Amino acid sequence: MKKKMILGALAILMLLPVHAQIAWKQVEPGVWKGVVGTPEDYSLLDVAAVTPLKESFARLPEVALPALANEIVGSIQDGKTSLRIPLQKKEQLYGFGLNFQTVHQRGKILNLHVDHYGGKDNGRTHAPVPFYISSLGYGVFINSARYLTVYAGSGARKDSPNAPVAKDRNTDKTWTASPYSDAVSTLVPAPGAEIYIFAGPTPMDVFRRYNLFCGGGTLPPRWGL
């Protein structure tokens, strides 16, 4: 009986999420890398095989690691990685790859999945990218080749210090299907993930750092302008 109780307790512990502390390492000026769990060998940066344009980073302003880095939470459960990145009240989000109808991405649920465009900017498109820029002057890139699910300020949590008040949709006219959310929550279907933070100070500087980090990009064809 005692042995069964011990085995049962171990089984329960295995089901509980393992919270990982993220240590940030500067890899380029204004660019930091963090690791949660054990990332897979196959990743977007490995496949792209790009080399950052190191000399060009010197032209950008010196910046410190954004304060929100210390508030990013990573956890692993059932072989999947969850990342939670804080959001401020009026913060706006841009990015996540190709979108045909929208610019502002906060408040959406995105399934970043390479697919034909189905008429909605929901992440299933020709070129989804796990990278976004904040209006506060920082960017986040998740280096995973998996199909990611992103709650871009659209998931409310009971344990949040800013948790919305529970309301009865049948009796309360102020009930909403989209209550306030104070975080970007991303599910990576893998036992680990690499996450990169790009500092600004402006959103344009964030984009410049991301572009330089990914090799500098190429000049688009004239017909694509």
Each model region followed by its residue ranges:
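Catalytic and substrate-binding clefts that recognize carbohydrates or anionic sugar/phosphate headgroups
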Residues: 21-222
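Hydrophobic alpha-helical segments and their boundary regions
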Residues: 6-9, 84-86
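Positively charged n-region of N-terminal signal peptides that target proteins for export
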Residues: 1-4
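Bacterial N-terminal signal peptides
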Residues: 8-17
